[in-house]
């Protein structure tokens, strides 16, 4: 009995075709034991029937062409992102087919912990569809179905960030597609793909495999960790960007990592409204996450940055942005309750990239083509010479204080005490730790009154 006849089992191909390593193992078993063929075909038929039943149950009845979705998989239909202005159904269906169809499986990593858009363990896959378009997608291993994904040409930013406040070192890979950075909407007629976040441990990639089923750890030039391995793979696949990681030359928090002693922290804790998150200051922009909606403030989308609500222990960062797809659309984002300990580092970062001056936005957009975020020596000199408006305000307060001391009135002590009490109540309300000792902060006399200072 030839191996060719085994490969002609259509029911096995249908049931296990999307999982090529498993399909290959089945055929190898059949080649060694041909008498098992009826059993494997019965299993394949049962699996195929389950897949058909699941697909029919999950599919909405007769969806309209304008509601075609670029992401298929389990989950409530309202959570699926629709194609913007979906009249371009030919292009939409092509993108959808490329993501879900059988494709050349190049690399897969089992049991990855995804946080966005779904919080579950899935199999990460990198595939190549007909036409040489490569996809990054996530497969439900139990149902053998694609949950979500994105074509590599549609990926705008890829970040690899340390997970804050964990006892064990971990990294989050963040995939930000075009039209889903939280600032610029997709172009009319273009599909909108989900942002994707998954977590990897700081260890060898034991669950990573080549498309043939060979463990990736057998590779001679394999990186030692999940982070290094996936970063090198993604950099190889990405054509117009690269994986961006935190850099000490850009920003390091003044507050060390609390759960891993001696390790530097690259994040800043902040709030957007009532939602707590982490801000990372990177070489290509500012990221805020890790909960939906993620926001990435690319340099070419930032009009200006200012500081507001400057208190004894905290301040707010206001980022004015302009959409790249709709230049008339501007919006301001406020990241609040940032610890004053991180002000010097944040201010140095803002000046380094000249984000404080809206008149320089065109120059920043021109430099955005350089994804390495490099800048010339003359720009550094300008940044160093640019004086912080917050420090100017502080000196003005000091001068005013000197003048008040000359006209000191003992009867004013009560007002001064009241101001200090208000400031302490403000701090106690937010429950922040006092990192202010020994720092050059806005004078405590400012109390709970917020001063808006634009950089």
Swiss-Prot record:
<comment type="function">
    <text>Histones H3 and H4 chaperone involved in the nucleosome formation and heterochromatin silencing. Required for the deposition of H3K56ac-carrying H3-H4 complex onto newly-replicated DNA. Plays a role in the transcriptional regulation of the cell-cycle dependent histone genes by creating a repressive structure at the core histone gene promoter.</text>
</comment>
<feature type="region of interest" description="Disordered">
    <location>
        <begin position="51"/>
        <end position="93"/>
    </location>
</feature>
<keyword id="KW-0805">Transcription regulation</keyword>
<feature type="compositionally biased region" description="Basic and acidic residues">
    <location>
        <begin position="374"/>
        <end position="397"/>
    </location>
</feature>
<dbReference type="GO" id="GO:0031491">
    <property type="term" value="F:nucleosome binding"/>
</dbReference>
<dbReference type="GO" id="GO:0005634">
    <property type="term" value="C:nucleus"/>
</dbReference>
<dbReference type="GO" id="GO:0042393">
    <property type="term" value="F:histone binding"/>
</dbReference>
<dbReference type="InterPro" id="IPR050454">
    <property type="entry name" value="RTT106/SSRP1_HistChap/FACT"/>
</dbReference>
<dbReference type="Pfam" id="PF08512">
    <property type="entry name" value="Rttp106-like_middle"/>
</dbReference>
<keyword id="KW-0143">Chaperone</keyword>
<dbReference type="InterPro" id="IPR013719">
    <property type="entry name" value="RTT106/SPT16-like_middle_dom"/>
</dbReference>
<comment type="similarity">
    <text>Belongs to the RTT106 family.</text>
</comment>
<dbReference type="InterPro" id="IPR011993">
    <property type="entry name" value="PH-like_dom_sf"/>
</dbReference>
<keyword id="KW-0804">Transcription</keyword>
<dbReference type="GO" id="GO:0003677">
    <property type="term" value="F:DNA binding"/>
</dbReference>
<keyword id="KW-0539">Nucleus</keyword>
<feature type="region of interest" description="Disordered">
    <location>
        <begin position="371"/>
        <end position="455"/>
    </location>
</feature>
<dbReference type="GO" id="GO:0005694">
    <property type="term" value="C:chromosome"/>
</dbReference>
<feature type="compositionally biased region" description="Low complexity">
    <location>
        <begin position="55"/>
        <end position="70"/>
    </location>
</feature>
<comment type="subunit">
    <text>Interacts with histones H3 and H4.</text>
</comment>
<keyword id="KW-0238">DNA-binding</keyword>
<feature type="compositionally biased region" description="Acidic residues">
    <location>
        <begin position="398"/>
        <end position="416"/>
    </location>
</feature>
<protein>
    <recommendedName>
        <fullName>Histone chaperone RTT106</fullName>
    </recommendedName>
</protein>
<feature type="compositionally biased region" description="Basic and acidic residues">
    <location>
        <begin position="432"/>
        <end position="446"/>
    </location>
</feature>
<keyword id="KW-0158">Chromosome</keyword>
């Amino acid at each position: 009995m030839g191996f060719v006849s085994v490969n002609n089992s259509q029911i096995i191909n249908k049931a296990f075709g999307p999982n090529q390593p498993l399909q290959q193992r089945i055929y190898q078993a059949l080649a060694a034991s041909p008498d098992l063929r009826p059993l494997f075909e019965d299993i394949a038929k049962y699996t195929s029937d389950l897949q058909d039943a699941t697909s029919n149950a999950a599919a909405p009845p007769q969806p309209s062409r304008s509601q075609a979705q670029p992401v298929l998989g389990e989950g409530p239909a309202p959570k699926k992102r629709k194609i913007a202005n979906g009249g371009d159904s030919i292009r939409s269906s092509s993108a959808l087919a490329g993501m879900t169809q059988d494709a050349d499986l190049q690399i897969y990593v089992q049991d990855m912990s995804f946080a966005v858009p779904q919080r579950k363990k899935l199999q990460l896959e990198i595939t190549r569809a007909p036409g040489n378009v490569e996809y990054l997608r996530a497969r439900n291993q139990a149902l053998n179905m694609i949950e979500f994904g994105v074509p590599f040409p549609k990926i705008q930013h890829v970040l690899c960030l340390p997970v804050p406040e964990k006892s064990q070192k971990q990294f989050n890979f963040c995939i930000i597609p075009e039209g889903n950075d939280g600032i610029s909407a997709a172009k009319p007629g273009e599909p909108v793909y989900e942002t994707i976040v998954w977590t990897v441990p700081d260890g060898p990639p034991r669950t990573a495999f080549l498309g043939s089923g060979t463990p990736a750890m057998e590779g001679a030039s394999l990186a030692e960790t999940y982070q290094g391995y996936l970063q090198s793979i993604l950099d190889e696949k990405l054509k117009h960007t690269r994986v961006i990681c935190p850099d000490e030359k850009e920003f390091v928090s003044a507050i060390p990592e609390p759960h891993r002693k001696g390790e530097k922290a690259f994040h800043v804790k902040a709030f957007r409204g009532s939602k707590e998150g982490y801000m990372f200051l990177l070489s290509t922009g500012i990221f805020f996450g890790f909960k939906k909606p993620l926001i990435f403030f690319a340099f070419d989308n930032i009009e200006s940055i200012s500081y507001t609500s400057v208190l004894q222990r905290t301040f707010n960062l206001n980022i004015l942005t302009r959409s790249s797809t709709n230049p008339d659309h501007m919006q301001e984002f406020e990241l609040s309750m940032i610890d004053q300990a991180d002000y010097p580092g944040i201010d140095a970062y803002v000046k380094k990239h000249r984000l404080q001056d809206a008149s320089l936005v065109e120059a920043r957009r021109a430099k955005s083509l350089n994804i390495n975020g490099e800048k010339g020596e003359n720009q550094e000199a300008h940044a160093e010479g640019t004086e912080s408006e917050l420090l100017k305000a502080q000196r003005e307060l000091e001068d005013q204080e000197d003048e008040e001391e000359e006209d000191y009135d003992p009867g004013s002590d009560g007002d001064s005490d009241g101001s200090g009490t208000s400031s302490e109540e403000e701090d106690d309300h937010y429950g922040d730790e006092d990192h202010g000792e020994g720092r050059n902060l806005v004078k405590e006399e400012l109390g709970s009154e917020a001063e808006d200072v634009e950089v």
